[in-house]
Each structure stands twice: as C-alpha cells, then as structure tokens.
Design a protein with these regions (language model features):
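Buried hydrophobic positions in well-ordered alpha/beta secondary-structure cores of metabolic enzymes
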Residues: 7, 32, 43-46, 87, ...
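Alpha-helix termination/capping residues and helix-transition junctions
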Residues: 37-40, 100
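Beta-strand segments within the central parallel beta-sheet cores of soluble alpha/beta enzyme folds
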Residues: 40-50, 77-82, 106-111
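Metallocofactor- and cofactor-centric catalytic cores in central/energy metabolism, strongly enriched
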Residues: 19-20, 24-26, 47, 53
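Condensing-enzyme catalytic core mediating Claisen C-C bond formation in acyl metabolism
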Residues: 1-18, 22, 31
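Conserved catalytic cysteine-centered active-site region
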Residues: 5, 16, 53-104, 115
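Short, well-ordered amphipathic alpha-helical segments that serve as non-catalytic structural scaffolds
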Residues: 22-37, 62, 90-93
Length: 115
C-alpha cells in the first residue's frame, strides 16, 4: 500500500467574509500548493467538503468552481457532504484514491493535494 502524507497546508482568516466558500477554499488551496512547493499541474483531482454551499450560497457545483478558481478547470472534482465529518470524508476518499494507485505517479512516490 502506498503511503500518504500532507505536504502543504493553507488557511484563511477566521470570521465573516464577503466571499463565497469556493473562493475561500481556492485561497487556502493556493497557499497549500505554494507551501508544498509543487506545480498546480501535479494535482490530479480535487475533493471538496462543504455542507452549506447548496443552501446558504445556492451553489451546488462548488468542487468544479473551486477547481476553476485554482486554474485547474479540467481535473475531476468530487464534493462531499457528511455533517460534522465532511472534511474527514473528503480527506479519506483522497487517501483511498492514492493508496489504491488510482491517483499519483505509477512508481513508489505520489504527489496529490487533498484540500
């Protein structure tokens, strides 16, 4: 089984924002990409966890929107809603894709950003 590691992190300021969650996600994701010192083109998929986008923002396509805001409009995206475990569900699925070999280079190492 392949090993998985978090190689970059990013965060937005806590508090009220005038931006939608996909924009906040893109800001944190861009920070994580810089922190990991990888090219955005190394990202093969996006796993987006959000429980309020549909109701609060009237936007049901947050994953593809976030990928587009990151400049990666053609990568596959999956949005997760799982109440208080939403982030866990998204992270878990990203890990499963990497460890199964479905994502990442086909050798011993794997680069994948789960944001």
């Amino acid at each position: 089984m392949r090993r998985v590691a978090v190689i970059g992190v990013g965060v937005t300021k806590f508090g009220k924002h005038d931006r939608i969650s996909a924009e906040l996600f893109a800001e944190a994701a861009a920070q994580a990409i810089r922190d990991a010192d990888i090219a955005p083109s190394a990202i093969e998929a996006l796993y987006y966890g959000n429980v309020t986008g549909g109701e609060g923002e009237r936007q049901l396509h947050m994953g593809p929107l976030a990928a587009t805001l990151l400049g990666l409009p053609t990568i596959p995206t999956t949005r997760f809603e799982n109440a208080c475990a939403t982030s866990h569900a998204a992270f878990r699925h990203a890990m499963m894709e990497i460890t199964s070999g479905a994502l990442g280079p086909r050798n011993a190492s794997s680069i994948m950003a789960s944001l």
